[in-house]
Curated annotation (Swiss-Prot):
This is Adenine phosphoribosyltransferase. Homodimer. Signal peptide: none annotated. It comes from Colwellia psychrerythraea (strain 34H / ATCC BAA-681) (Vibrio psychroerythus). Pathway: Purine metabolism; AMP biosynthesis via salvage pathway; AMP from adenine: step 1/1.
Length: 181
């Protein structure tokens, strides 16, 4: 990504202070989605990064991971698997509790969504503490699938998510990093 492209993405992502709780600087990717040029650029950059890498499925985390994971799956001609909050998936599920930077939650995946033959790429909008991706990784591995990489639009390196993913042997990649926030 060149500097012009990077600046386009930075300009398209709005920062909302003290949301959802005081002390959080929320990076709003929904503003990026409103900018067709920026959204298209994100999808092209992710496609170029991951095409031809042998992934068989993309797992996207609720909810903003769906916004980038599903179109990327289409571009790569592979399936998309949603990981959702409790009670949102109709077939039998596995659940995993996790901590996030401003609370606690649970994620679920369909029990039949993946097989040991699957090589999975996780996609989400933002990497902060890594709790969401740790829970997602545990769900994927519980189904026997392989997962070693996760892609993000934004990462906040100072919150420790990259280190947390390294402990899980997950290599993170992000388009934009916000240091010191």
């Amino acid at each position: 990504m060149n500097k012009t492209q990077q600046q386009l993405l930075i300009n398209a992502i709005h920062t909302i202070p003290d949301y959802p709780v005081e002390g959080i600087m929320f990076r709003d990717v929904t503003s990026l989605l409103e900018d067709a040029e920026a959204f298209k650029l994100v999808m092209e950059l992710l496609e170029n990064k991951y095409k031809g890498r042998g992934f068989t499925k993309i797992v996207g985390t609720e909810a903003r991971g769906f916004l980038f994971g599903a179109p990327l799956a289409l571009a790569l001609n592979i399936g998309f698997i949603p990981v959702r909050k409790p009670g949102k998936l109709p077939r039998p599920t596995y659940s995993q509790a996790y901590q996030l930077e401003y609370g606690e939650d649970i994620l679920e995946i369909h029990q039949d969504a993946l097989t040991p033959e699957d090589n999975v790429l996780i996609i989400d909008d933002l990497l902060a503490t890594g709790g969401t991706i740790e829970a997602t990784t545990k769900l994927i591995r519980r189904l026997g699938a392989q997962v070693q990489e996760a892609g993000f639009v934004i990462s906040l390196p100072d919150l420790g998510g990259e280190e947390r993913l390294a402990e899980l042997n997950i290599t993170p990649y992000s388009l934009i990093q916000y240091q010191g926030e």
